Each structure stands twice: as structure tokens, then as C-alpha cells.
Amino acid sequence: MRRRAVFLDRDGVINRTIMRNGKPCPPASVEEIELLPGVKSCLEKLCDLGLFPIVVTNQPDVARGAQRMEIVEQIHASLIQRLPLQGIVVCYHDDSDNCSCRKPEPGLLLEAAARWSIDLERSFMIGDRWKDVEAGRRAGCTTFLIERTYSEKERCVADYCVESLVQATEIVVGRIAQASHEGTQDQ
């Protein structure tokens, strides 16, 4: 039987987004990583339910020359050391590269599904940008949008709009408990 996953965007979901010149930006170093409240306990709850937490993240600053790949890899090594994550799948491309992995394309989720034998239709995508939700939708996942005050040009329709990973986790736990009680395999 294929596994279920919770795909998570990184910045704004796992760790605090850094605002620079009014725009949400990723941490520039390991020292700038600040985990959001409740993240570790949420991931532990999801693992306890048999879900695989997998980070799927766009990191275009590498392609733009604004960040070194080694720094991004150090940040990810730190997150894997601190949190119960199955793995982290990264797109280093910029929009102009027209790749299939950069969200809103579903390539990162498809790659993770192939690598870890994930059942996408029984999995979840949690993000804070329209691109996260759209990637999850295109991959067939149940989607969550953590509402932030970003100025987004695109609008999205998520299955659930929530305030935090904590709230999203409560919904996932509730759906799985309800399905278990009803004896169904669905969420």
C-alpha cells in the first residue's frame, strides 16, 4: 500500500518568512531560521498518524545568484536535524526557466511521490502562497492555504483556509480520526 504524505512549503509554514523591502523572503542563513510556533509538535502528530512530512520548496534565489546552494543545503540539514521530516525536495529554478518542478507545477510532489511511494490523492499540501495550493491541486492532494498578508497577484481556492500549521494539523487529524471511526480508507 502506498503511503500518505503531508507536503509542506518551507518559508511561512515551517519557519518564519523574513520580510525584506516589503516582500516575503527566505532566511539568508541557518542563523536566520526561526521555527514557527508548534511546528515540531505538529509534525510529530502527523508522523504518529503514519503520515510522511515532506517539505517541497521553491528556492529561486539560487538561480538568481542571490543565494548559494550550499547555504540552502545547510538550512535544510538544520531543519532535518531539528524536525521529524521524511525529506526535503527543492526546485532551484526561476520562473523564466520553465521547469516542471517549480510550484505551481506539481513536479516536486510528483518526484516525492515516486521516491517514497506516496498516494497523492490521499495526501495533503499545506502552503502559504497560491503556488503551493495550485501545485497540490494539480497533484491531486487536499490543499490548505495558511493565510498571510502577502500581496499576491494570483488568487487561489484551497480546500481549507487556515491561520497556521497548527490549525491545518487539527483538521488533518480530525479527518483521519473520522475516517477511522467510519471504517473508511479515505481522509
Which sequence ranges carry the predicted segments?
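Acidic, Mg2+-coordinating phosphoryl-transfer loop and its flanking beta/alpha structural elements
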Residues: 125-163
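Short, electropositive alpha-helical surface patch
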Residues: 62-83, 103-115, 144
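Structural recognition of alpha->loop->beta junctions
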Residues: 75-95, 153-173
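Active-site neighborhood of HAD-like aspartate-dependent phosphohydrolases
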Residues: 1-52
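Hydrophobic "anchor" residues on beta-strands that sit immediately upstream
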Residues: 5-7, 54, 124, 160
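Non-catalytic pre-domain segments flanking phosphatase-related domains
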Residues: 1-10, 18, 170, 174-186
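Substrate-recognition element of Asp-dependent hydrolases with the DxDx(T/V) motif
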Residues: 39-72, 76, 85-94, 136
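Conserved Lys-Pro-Asp/Glu-containing loop-to-beta segment of HAD-superfamily phosphomonoesterases
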Residues: 100-131
